[in-house]
Amino acid sequence: MNNQWRFTGNELKYVTDVIASGEGSSTSGNYNSLFEKEFAKKCGAKYAVTFNSGTSTLHAALHALGVGYGDEVIIPPVTVISNFDVTVAANAIPVFADVDPETFNICPKE
């Protein structure tokens, strides 16, 4: 059984560069900026923004949508806690919707 890493490109060089630079944050450094530019280009967008976590991304999404005090955000009860947390942090009201037992996705009929 061979459990060695399999690199198909410049992955090892890039990781080594990041470690050597001392800028190991997931949202700083040259590689992060390069990724944002290339991702935006691939998506046909002017800009792209990366985040350090899914929770940070959800916070930003609710803020960008203008979700705030008294707004209702529909979320499934079978989910990660951050969906609930960011809704409450935005002073919005989490509303749990039933899920389809086959897919665990929100059931549109409910």
Located regions from the model:
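Conserved PLP-binding active-site segment in aminotransferase class I/II-type PLP enzymes
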Residues: 1-64, 68-69, 90
